[in-house]
């Protein structure tokens, strides 16, 4: 890979900005100042800007704690999007949410620029689970629990895959739901079959990776390689 391209991708700058860094002697390759953007890097080469090493990332994976009122989209003419919350941290990346949460819902949203990985975790055949804490307006019943386990048939005739539901509070109004399917407004429609409404919905985990409790609503952080793997291996 050319040095100027490497700088643009790892330092999150434009090619012209990378050229400026090079011309000012701020870039080193294996400890030696290099001003030629056309320099071809070899495996194992160490690149630094102002002495700070740069690490190449082919893709970015972010965990975001989505607040209420934000839409799960890359762009929107009216509302703040999950990508808007990232700001200018990745100007050269085309980030998008892998899956969605309703505007009123909160919790774990995965943002990435890796289309292949997004397809992998969303594909029905992969069965990557999503876990939610849900507040309903009618106590959980054995009929609901059994129906979820057997697979709910929605009002429009759509037959859903089996899911898991359990009460988290003695009154049965706060429950945990685990799905391996992604149908529009699925949880609300599932409870609607039993005449129950959903007052709040929070995504706690995707696959084997739980939302970091240190992230306040609207905050985000990068995932480690191990965490990315946990999403699919712990599904």
Model region roles, listed by residue range:
Residues 1-235:
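Basic, flexible Lys/Arg- and Gly-enriched helix-loop patches that mediate nucleic-acid binding at interfaces
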